[in-house]
Amino acid sequence: MGWSCLVTGAGGLLGQRIVRLLVEEKELKEIRALDKAFRPELREEFSKLQNRTKLTVLEGDILDEPFLKRACQDVSVVIHTACIIDVFGVTHRESIMNVNVKGTQLLLEACVQASVPVFIYTSSIEVAGPNSYKEIIQNGHEEEPLENTWPTPYPYSKKLAEKAVLAANGWNLKNGDTLYTCALRPTYIYGEGGPFLSASINEALNNNGILSSVGKFSTVNPVYVGNVAWAHILALRALRDPKKAPSVRGQFYYISDDTPHQSYDNLNYILSKEFGLRLDSRWSLPLTLMYWIGFLLEVVSFLLSPIYSYQPPFNRHTVTLSNSVFTFSYKKAQRDLAYKPLYSWEEAKQKTVEWVGSLVDRHKETLKSKTQ
């Protein structure tokens, strides 16, 4: 008996990787790839995958209820990756809460109406923190009662959405069956197409090859995008397996891999040093001072808000996020989902470095065309 899967956010960094892996799954009769918009080159890539499995591209809004109901019709599994990721406070709070929280709630309701039995949610490490750069979390695990206390819209919205997904586990579906859910909390995701890495590299290329310091004092365990996608495949397999499902239903899992624990600055450097990019060697402000400057910038932004929208370069949340010791173990995912990274650190590094090389080449071409 064939089954079908809807992937929301399928045009994003993670969503498209999940789609590529889904094509390999047995007895999968249809993949529905949903997003607000798809780049032409991704549409072309998806059309090539049609030879393997029926792949339907759906463009629409996560807040459009009739659209979601149509998208969920006759679907066996929903993988919900769609969200607004915003750690710098660029996007309006209401937009983030609408897409990340209300959109998730509407999708859960659409699953009930369409009797979709399996729902997998892409959560975030930020649901757990960090709340203070002074608090050290090393090899954190699911049994620790960690919860983000920042009012910042992105982590707050992901926390509420994850709670909604896990609370929906056990809901009755329209056809009398039961909805089963789980959530995956990846650590910082890097890899080809990564928006934060891309921004850092492009900024350095326009700054004499000097990488700006984003997190000199941090120790984190970044995770390769291909391994996060693989964890989603294993989660759907587990929730569809009567033997494995009971221990996975209603659970959340930290997803990391064997990428070495390091600072954000060091990761950016390792992935770009062969192209001559280097770390900023200038003296940097002490962390405590950075934190309180961040607070002052927030106050200025708030006071100016009635007349002017001032976007501070950093705030207390970004200082904390970028400079904490915050690492997590994937042992629970290993135990319940049989998760083992699909890509080693060496493979992940090689693939990402090749992609960074393409950014460097593109920059050179741009410079060449400007001088002609």
UniProtKB/Swiss-Prot annotation:
It catalyses: a 3beta-hydroxy-Delta(5)-steroid + NAD(+) = a 3-oxo-Delta(5)-steroid + NADH + H(+); a 3-oxo-Delta(5)-steroid = a 3-oxo-Delta(4)-steroid; pregnenolone + NAD(+) = pregn-5-ene-3,20-dione + NADH + H(+); pregn-5-ene-3,20-dione = progesterone. It is found in: Endoplasmic reticulum membrane; Mitochondrion membrane. CDD domains: 3b-HSD_HSDB1_like_SDR_e (cd09811). Changing P186L: In AH2; activity abolished. The chain crosses the membrane at residues 287-307. Changing A10V: In AH2; nonsalt-wasting form. GO terms for cellular component: cilium; cytoplasm; endoplasmic reticulum; endoplasmic reticulum membrane; intercellular bridge; intracellular membrane-bounded organelle; membrane; microtubule cytoskeleton. Gene3D superfamilies: NAD(P)-binding Rossmann-like Domain (3.40.50.720). One of its GO terms (biological process) is C21-steroid hormone metabolic process. Pfam families: 3Beta_HSD. 3-beta-HSD is a bifunctional enzyme, that catalyzes the oxidative conversion of Delta(5)-ene-3-beta-hydroxy steroid, and the oxidative conversion of ketosteroids. The 3-beta-HSD enzymatic system plays a crucial role in the biosynthesis of all classes of hormonal steroids. It is linked to Adrenal hyperplasia 2: A form of congenital adrenal hyperplasia, a common recessive disease due to defective synthesis of cortisol. Congenital adrenal hyperplasia is characterized by androgen excess leading to ambiguous genitalia in affected females, rapid somatic growth during childhood in both sexes with premature closure of the epiphyses and short adult stature. Mild HSD3B2 deficiency in hyperandrogenic females is associated with characteristic traits of polycystic ovary syndrome, such as insulin resistance and luteinizing hormone hypersecretion. PANTHER family: BIFUNCTIONAL POLYMYXIN RESISTANCE PROTEIN ARNA, SHORT CHAIN DEHYDROGENASE_REDUCTASE FAMILY 42E, MEMBER 2. Belongs to the 3-beta-HSD family. This is 3 beta-hydroxysteroid dehydrogenase/Delta 5-->4-isomerase type 2. It comes from Homo sapiens. The gene is HSD3B2.
